[in-house]
Design a protein with these regions (language model features):
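Alpha-helical transmembrane segments of multi-pass membrane transport proteins
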Residues: 1-234
């Protein structure tokens, strides 16, 4: 009976438009306060005891928060501008730049959905404007977004390392080469398809634009350098 009431509360909140996270949280709190003998204090204590020895998992919510800040704070736009300046002049340049931007953002966010949302919302619209098909643009970003869990730092790697008691740093190092190879192979494939289909390419913007866009994206690129040189622990890095 209690379980049925809990499900009814969640579904009712979802039907009136309450966000999923808030629906789950409020229904659980209401259930604990009214229908359960367990106190909220004991739940907090149990959670703390479960986290003991697995402090690396604290990096996960910080990665999610950091990716949200970078998506809304303009870091994604600066990375896209830098990517277009570097590779946008090749055949299929905007698509290749989208993959390159996904690789850079993946090295910051550690999440595939965050990478797709941050880069895809900008790049797909740009690709459609210059003549790419909707299917091709969506396919490129969908494939490039998967690099978010392969190129370190990765949330999946943090969870696996914590569950198996292996080094997070070693997990990150193990994902560098496969992630780079996957990204490069995807860019080469786009280049070949662009040559065969005569897809649009951008103009060479010059070294001044590369340096100018790099200066704007410097803090995002600096965070990548910090993560890959292991100057801090994973949790400290994302903070």
């Amino acid at each position: 009976m209690e379980v049925a009431i809990l499900f009814i509360l969640v579904i009712a909140m979802l039907m009136i438009g309450v966000p999923i996270a808030i629906s789950l949280g409020l229904s659980s709190i209401f259930f604990l306060l009214t229908l359960s003998d367990t106190s909220l204090a004991s739940i907090a204590q149990s959670f703390f005891q479960a986290m003991a020895g697995h402090y690396t998992l604290l990096a996960i919510p910080f990665f999610i928060l950091a990716s949200s800040f970078m998506s809304t704070g303009g870091v994604a736009k600066r990375i896209i501008r830098f990517s277009i300046a570097v590779v946008g002049h090749f055949p299929g340049g905007l698509a290749i730049a989208g993959v390159f931007a996904c690789m850079l953002f993946a090295a910051l966010s550690g999440s595939s959905p965050a990478t797709v949302v941050a880069i895809g919302t900008i790049v797909i619209a740009g690709m459609r404007q210059v003549g790419y098909s909707k299917e091709f643009a969506a396919g490129v970003i969908a494939n490039a977004g998967t690099l978010g869990i392969l190129i370190p730092p990765s949330i999946v790697m943090v969870v696996y390392a914590s569950a198996t008691d292996v080094s997070v740093g070693r997990m990150f190092l193990a994902g560098v080469i496969p992630g780079l190879l996957a990204g490069i192979m995807l860019m080469v494939t786009i280049y070949i398809i662009a040559k065969m289909r005569n897809l649009p390419k951008g103009d060479w913007l010059g070294w001044n634009e590369i340096f100018a866009s790099a200066r704007e994206a410097v803090w995002g690129l600096f965070l990548i350098a910090v993560s890959y040189t292991h100057l801090t622990l994973p949790t400290n890095t994302v903070v």
